[in-house]
Curated annotation (Swiss-Prot):
Name of the gene encoding the protein in the UniProt record: THI1-2
Subunit structure, interactors included: Homooctamer.
Cofactor names: Fe cation
2,3-didehydroalanine (Cys) sites (modified residues): C220
Boundaries of the annotated transit peptide in chain numbering: 1-72
Keyword DNA repair annotated: no
Protein name per Swiss-Prot or TrEMBL: Thiamine thiazole synthase 2, chloroplastic
Main location: plastid
Family per record: Belongs to the THI4 family.
Length: 355
């Protein structure tokens, strides 16, 4: 693969390799740096500010621009993205924590083009907050290795870690992911249907999200399409926009049932979500909480490790479907050095972690 100019900036002064040189925490290969756990301190933090401003705030003035230039720049670039990704390698439907983790893992291969479809204006799903609108995010070990790879600090406990604010995870993974040249996020865009050819999912039917929500009030609002070699459905649990991928598969007879997720059981749920992440029909992989809907697995509540690892597993399943090296088949770069602690426990484990 040709070298690319995009680089990561370390927390230290040492330069880091280009993004595709970073090794995945999914298959246990070494990564470029680790972030130490947060040390709790009761001292007031100090903020240092530069004594020299890059501009004079008293007399600040922008360079002139024509309004039409702004319009043309936005329109031209978006239309070129639509043309580029009208036929792509992977389409990920849903930009929650599982979908973003999947896209991040896929984007390490610069030869794979990844389009992300998100019906909301703001991607991230429920990963902007922890449970009950609280801010902290709990991640059970060993999924914290993914946080190390992303460079996210956390408070380390015996069997889990806690991120100060869930938004730190979501904003960090998005900032790294969306900077990569082989990824495009189409937010405020809904996947209204699937493209199916000869019993294989071959893409998605798209429309502006606001149009999708108003088909009953307007007429003649036909959709667009996006062909893909692989579709990853990461639509979350059941709801107005949830589990839409598997519900559509049922309605067209490609699967028999969508029983819905069972009551909460964290210790069973997270392992089950990762284990059951798979290609459910030819051309379509299901990841995240949508897995619980199709398999009747328990809901997990406000823990997020399974979303991250399920997304990574979905990425490697997609790589396998594309004929690329992947951790599922063990032919991914340095995959043979998988660390034992990255192999999740069996779903039937009886161990319960209590803070």
């Amino acid at each position: 693969m040709a070298s690319m100019a995009t680089t990561l900036t370390s927390l230290s002064s040492n330069p880091k390799p280009a993004f595709f040189d970073n090794k995945s925490s999914f298959h246990g290969s070494p990564i470029s740096y680790r972030v130490l756990p947060i040390k709790v301190s009761h001292q007031s933090p100090t903020i240092s500010m530069s004594s020299v401003s890059p501009y004079d705030l008293q007399s600040f003035k922008f360079e002139p621009i024509k309004e039409s230039i702004v319009a043309r720049e936005m329109t031209r670039r978006y239309m070129m993205d639509m043309i580029t990704y009208a036929d792509t390698d992977v389409v990920i439907v849903g930009a929650g924590s599982a979908g973003l983790s999947c896209a991040y893992e896929l984007s390490k291969n610069p030869s794979i083009r990844v389009a992300i479809i998100e019906q909301s204006v703001s991607p991230g799903g429920g990963a902007w907050l922890g449970g009950q609108l609280f801010s902290a995010m709990v991640v059970r070990k060993p999924a914290h290795h993914f946080l190390d790879e992303l460079g996210i600090e956390y408070d380390e406990q015996d069997n889990y870690v806690v991120i100060k604010h869930a938004a730190l995870f979501t904003s960090t993974i998005m900032s790294k992911l969306l900077a990569r040249p082989n990824v495009k996020l189409f937010n405020a865009v809904a996947a209204e249907d699937l493209i199916v050819k000869e019993e294989r999912v071959a893409g998605v039917v798209t429309n502006w999200a606001l149009v999708s929500m108003n088909h009953d009030t307007q007429s003649c609002m036909d959709p667009n399409v996006m062909e893909a070699k692989v579709v990853v459905s990461s639509c979350g649990h059941d709801g107005p926009f949830g589990a839409t991928g598997v519900k559509r598969l049922k309605s067209i007879g490609m699967i028999d049932s969508v029983p819905g997720m069972k009551a909460l059981d964290m210790n069973t749920a997270e392992d089950a979500i990762v284990r059951l992440t798979r290609e459910i029909v030819p051309g379509m992989i299901v990841t995240g909480m949508e897995v619980a809907e199709i398999d009747g697995a328990p809901r997990m509540g406000p823990t997020f490790g399974a979303m991250m690892i399920s997304g990574q597993k979905a990425a490697h399943l997609a790589l396998r479907a594309l004929g690329q090296p992947n951790a599922i088949d063990g032919n991914y770069t340095e995959a043979e050095t998988m660390q034992p602690e990255l192999i999740l426990a069996a779903a039937e484990t009886g161990e319960i972690v209590d803070a």
